[in-house]
């Protein structure tokens, strides 16, 4: 089962409570990047292209706890970089569990065998192992041969030790629906508790700029994949059925970037997990000081092809709460994989992209250099 009954009940109660209180914007999952340092250099990743002085930064345990206290989300997803490079990661996970949060710890599994004894199985804790398809697909995606076998070994080890274990799979242009469906069958046989799948986002700093999916290609790809698995019912996904329905082109959704806010070494990232257009010092500043109407499909050029879960899963969850009847046909027959697509959001009036990455890097480097000797954070990586 991808989501435990306890998690479904707790998160559902939280969402309903927010609506009853009349809150228009609220966080569902805290996205935490406690460091950018990684032991891979994936072709489609735009998260690690920083100078060493920034790659060596990390969030302290106290900063990580402060982030969840500020935003109050019921779930935390810890990414990076590679989180297992963070020396204090076991303490961070324990701190979130002590606060009764549901924790997803993302990893490429290269260090999992070495680190797994530092963690204890808990129904509220899940490993999320990066696996972008079968052996050829995944090794090409991460630009290192042999990583697929290590990820599969990590899945088997985690399951043997009694951990809840899921995979996170990002798909790019050129992905073949038949191969992806066969891959989903294979990881299901491995006993994973769930699959998180999403199209890749076109990071401006990613090394490979040629293989990101357009919205049209995303919809066709997911219809092809899901049609080979009984509308997706053959597999256990961690995401809302309505989000999968959206990926298949059957829903017209605007994104809710505040539903999965990101805290990283720069601060609270504006406006979302994918776009670093600015940074706030506090969660409240992020929520109150971001002009949300400036971002999203049809509003901003960088958002044009985005269909990623960190922007649209929150929308799908809200839709399932406010219009629960939409879930019934999905439960009965799965995602519709034929017929016309739902209308898409027009792009005619989107504002042009602004490129601010270099400015943010320069400002962060200046901040690091201005610190007094002896006040530098400890090295992030081992």
Language-model regions, residue ranges each:
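Radical SAM enzyme core and accessory elements
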Residues: 1-25, 277-282, 297-382
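Conserved alpha-helical substructure of the radical SAM core
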Residues: 2-118, 122-123, 327, 333, ...
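Conserved residues at the C-terminal ends of beta-strands
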Residues: 48, 79, 130, 198, ...
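Generic structural signal for helix capping and beta-alpha/helix-loop junctions
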Residues: 52, 85, 113, 136, ...
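Accessory C-terminal segments flanking Radical SAM cores
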Residues: 223, 233-329
